[in-house]
């Protein structure tokens, strides 16, 4: 069962915003039906990103309605864009990591003009071994045009 805004535990990361994630509007206003475990995972993810609902923040306020920044939560995770492959949002090489984790070095494709003959031959051998270059492919066309 998905807790409501009135019945959820705002201090439980898995319930903090689970109530707000239910029936998210899709096309023509139809709500998305999502398994409660996914909603709880997403709620916890947002918690780790540092998001808090306004009701939770109000609980931090003093009698004058002020909240000192030292009371605010720390972000625990950060998004790391894809470090290899195409640079777009659909690349699964992107990931969430601890906030202080170093970003991975992007994979660089070597410039074959800067490689030695031995290095180029080693790369070609790997492509042949893995089937990217076929050994049994036909050679160039040998036909001539006769008029």
Curated annotation (Swiss-Prot):
Domain of life according to the entry: Viruses
InterPro entries, per database record: Phage_gene29
Organism name: Mycobacterium phage D29
Protein name as it appears in the record: Gene 29 protein
């Amino acid at each position: 069962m998905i807790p409501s805004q009135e019945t959820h535990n705002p201090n439980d990361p898995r319930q903090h915003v689970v109530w707000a994630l239910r029936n998210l509007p899709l096309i023509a206003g139809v709500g998305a039906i999502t398994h409660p475990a996914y909603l709880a995972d997403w709620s916890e993810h947002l918690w780790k990103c540092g998001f808090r609902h306004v009701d939770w923040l109000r609980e931090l306020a003093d009698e004058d309605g002020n909240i000192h920044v030292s009371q605010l939560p720390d972000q625990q995770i950060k998004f790391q864009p894809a470090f290899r492959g195409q640079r777009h949002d659909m690349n699964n090489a992107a990931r969430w990591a601890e906030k202080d984790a170093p970003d991975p070095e992007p994979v660089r494709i070597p410039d074959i003009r800067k490689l030695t003959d031995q290095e180029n031959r080693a790369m070609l051998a790997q492509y042949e071994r893995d089937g990217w270059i076929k050994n049994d492919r036909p050679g160039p066309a040998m036909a001539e045009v006769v008029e």
